[in-house]
Amino acid sequence: MISEKVKNQIQVVQGDITKLDCDGIVNAANRSLLGGGGVDGAIHRAAGPELLAECRMLHGCRTGEAKITKGYRLKAKYIIHTVGPIYSGTAEDAAQLADCYRNSLNLAKEHDVHSIAFPAISTGVYGYPLEDATEIAVKTVAQWLEAHAYYAMQVIFCCFDARTERVYQARL
């Protein structure tokens, strides 16, 4: 059960994550961090070529980890890049997906980010079932917010379509 205090810190919206006005957005990246399809490609296109140049200097990212760059041409000051698991149905997938959210939030806090937007990590071409991924996302974020109650953080789950938005809303 999610407390009312935590529920008030979480928002679900349908839209384009690259257009959100918040301190940081999370990029569901691939291991190279050099751009790709889906939200990753959209973020790279919107942020501009400077993002790719900075990402090259990061030398990739392991699954479940997170790295941070400037937001460049986005409204967001920062982009936090995390690599979700390619779904295979194992417990390791769930642990790595939870790590994506937890490590992104920890990195955001280290950089004084107080509002952060997440896409539905791993639910596109990486094949993670939406309902399962949403449960992990909401549970992990809620646990982090409870554990860091002293830190003012607003979390936005930015959904690509109406179905995803409905699934997230149902979990809150």
Regions found by a protein language model. Give the residues of each.
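Phosphate/ribose-phosphate-bearing ligand recognition and processing surfaces
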Residues: 87-172
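Glycine-/small-residue-enriched capping loops at alpha/beta junctions
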Residues: 1-94, 98-110
